[in-house]
Design a protein with these regions (language model features):
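Catalytic Walker B motif of ABC-type/P-loop ATPase nucleotide-binding domains
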Residues: 146-149
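Conserved ABC ATPase signature
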Residues: 121-125, 129
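Conserved ABC ATPase "signature" region
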Residues: 100-117, 169
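Hydrophobic anchor residue at the start of the ABC signature
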Residues: 135
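A short, proline-enriched helix->beta-strand linker immediately N-terminal to the Walker B motif
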Residues: 140-144
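Helix-to-loop junction immediately C-terminal to a conserved catalytic motif
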Residues: 54
Length: 237
């Protein structure tokens, strides 16, 4: 499967009759079968970029190549579950193929730690469990490409770490492409095969990480230096 390519993509919003450029001339290659992380501060255009690639919004200039033939799924910051459906029915909701592979669904449910909550309803789940359902639903759709908009930002540190590990585990078996938005540098370093720094609607820098996620040590000199460089890129004081 080929990746996705953005060529000179710009997006404008009109606020009180004034045109504001939210994204400005974005050139970006999103590689296939990898996790590409978009990192930046609030208001830099991360979510807008995600929505353009997903097709939820239209861009005003440029081209986005390679999306038409791809099956896409989206994981939002909030869970967006159906309160009247149990865990399994929420996960299979929207899968129109009547020949659902129940063994595959069961494997996904087990991978994200929901085996004991198979028949539970959203009101019975914690925030972390609800996001597990959202992620399982995205992968159950068997997509080529998943967009994730800060899906772990509302979780506590320990749950967030668990979710990162579970995402990496399930990605290993699916090998789909993921475009992941975050404002956490550590999260970007843990998850990203490619890290894209976005600032005020433009790409400031890009980094590729060759090490497997399972072997990364953020206290290693290489990652300490990379984190410092990213902090400098973001002008974080």
């Amino acid at each position: 499967m080929d990746g996705i390519k953005l060529v000179n993509v710009s997006k404008f919003y009109t606020v009180e009759k004034e045109s504001i450029k939210v994204l400005n001339g974005i050139d970006l290659n999103i590689p296939a079968n990898k996790i590409t992380v978009i990192l930046g501060r609030s208001g830099c255009g991360k979510t807008t970029l995600l929505r353009l690639v997903s097709g939820l919004e239209e861009f005003d200039q440029g081209e986005i190549l390679g999306t038409n033939s791809k099956r896409k799924a989206y994981v939002f910051q909030e869970d967006r579950l159906m309160p009247w459906l149990d865990v399994k029915k929420n996960i299979t909701f929207g899968i129109h193929n009547k020949n659902i592979d129940n063994r595959k669904i069961d494997r996904i449910i087990e991978t994200v730690g929901l085996k004991k909550f198979y028949s539970a309803y959203p009101r019975q789940l914690s925030g972390g469990m609800k996001q597990r359902v959202s992620i399982a639903r995205a992968f159950a759709y068997d997509p080529d490409f998943i967009m994730m908009d800060e899906p772990f930002s509302a979780l506590d540190f320990f749950t967030r770490e668990q979710m990162q590990n579970e995402l990496l585990k399930i990605h290993q078996t699916s090998k789909c492409s993921i475009l992941f938005v975050t404002h956490s540098i550590d999260e970007a370093l843990i998850l990203g095969d490619k890290i894209v720094i976005l600032e005020k609607g433009v790409i400031k820098s890009q980094y590729e990480i060759k090490e497997k996620s399972s072997t990364r040590d953020l206290l290693d000199d290489k990652f300490v230096k990379l984190k410092k460089q990213i902090i400098d890129d973001l002008k974080v004081i």
